[in-house]
């Protein structure tokens, strides 16, 4: 099972990716995770990427493709893989094609912008553990405090409302074109063309998971 998850930032791709990778026993290749690890380690790549992400921009194709190519060489990708947050642009999608990266399915998770702004701007994180809360959907027992340690929660820079809206604008301008790109490729009947599936990403998490599994079964 080799697939790409498409959808706006905050559409729930990461959550559904977790369910899919467990069901099919494949690694989730998240450029966000790879970038955050680089930021945390303070590598030159990480420092450059943090500045771009904090401003709501997209990290350059060269940086991302370099990370992805290295990742696909690892042994756990032999049976398949799940891309979450990649490709984000037509040049990245073309680079994947040229590199011979096989894709069986492209799954789009569709969520309205207003729902995404509410989801993301309400996130709060405990920096030391990575535990995540939401002021409305999953609040801590004490407002602004981690349940286990009582330490302060923070709002990540890329979860602030202004940044979320900018990221959505960037998504609509640069990444949404991939919906058409993969739809056309899927409809072309060309050898190696993936199947394209679209599901609604609003509602109970389990319901969205079941929709995703059903989409990947046909």
UniProtKB/Swiss-Prot annotation:
- Give an example GO cellular component term for this record: cytoplasm
- UniProt protein name: Adenylate kinase
InterPro entries reported in the protein's UniProt record = Adenyl_kin_sub, Adenylat/UMP-CMP_kin, Adenylat_kinase_CS, Adenylate_kinase_lid-dom, P-loop_NTPase
Key word Transmembrane present in the record?
A: no
Q: Which domain of life is it from?
A: Bacteria
The protein's annotated catalytic reaction(s) are:
AMP + ATP = 2 ADP
List localization entries: Cytoplasm
- Written domain comment of the UniProt record: Consists of three domains, a large central CORE domain and two small peripheral domains, NMPbind and LID, which undergo movements during catalysis. The LID domain closes over the site of phosphoryl transfer upon ATP binding. Assembling and dissambling the active center during each catalytic cycle provides an effective means to prevent ATP hydrolysis.
Residues the entry annotates as binding ATP: 10-15, 123, 132-133, 203
What does the UniProt keyword field contain? Answer: ATP-binding, Cytoplasm, Kinase, Nucleotide biosynthesis, Nucleotide-binding, Transferase
Q: What does this protein do?
A: Catalyzes the reversible transfer of the terminal phosphate group between ATP and AMP. Plays an important role in cellular energy homeostasis and in adenine nucleotide metabolism.
One GO BP annotation of this record: AMP salvage
């Amino acid at each position: 099972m080799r697939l790409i998850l498409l959808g706006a930032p905050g559409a729930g791709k990461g959550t559904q990716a977790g369910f899919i990778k467990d069901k099919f026993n494949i690694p989730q290749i998240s450029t966000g995770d790879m970038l955050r690890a680089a930021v945390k380690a303070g590598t030159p790549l990480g420092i450059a990427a943090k500045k771009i992400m904090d401003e709501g921009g997209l990290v350059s194709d060269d940086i991302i493709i370099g990370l992805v190519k290295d990742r696909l060489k690892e042994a756990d990708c032999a049976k398949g893989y799940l891309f979450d947050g990649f490709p984000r642009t037509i040049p990245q999608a073309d680079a994947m094609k040229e590199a011979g990266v096989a894709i069986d399915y492209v799954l789009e998770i569709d969520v309205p912008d207003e729902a995404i702004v509410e989801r993301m701007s309400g996130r709060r994180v405990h920096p030391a553990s990575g535990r995540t809360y939401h002021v409305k959907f999953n609040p801590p027992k004490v407002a602004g405090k981690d349940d286990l340690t009582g330490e302060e929660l923070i709002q990540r820079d890329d979860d602030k409302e202004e940044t979320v809206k900018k990221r959505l604008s960037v998504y609509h301008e640069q990444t949404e074109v991939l919906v058409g790109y993969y739809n056309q490729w899927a409809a072309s009947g060309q050898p190696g063309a993936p199947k394209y599936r679209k599901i609604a990403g609003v509602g109970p998490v389990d319901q969205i998971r079941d929709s995703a599994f059903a989409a990947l079964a046909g």
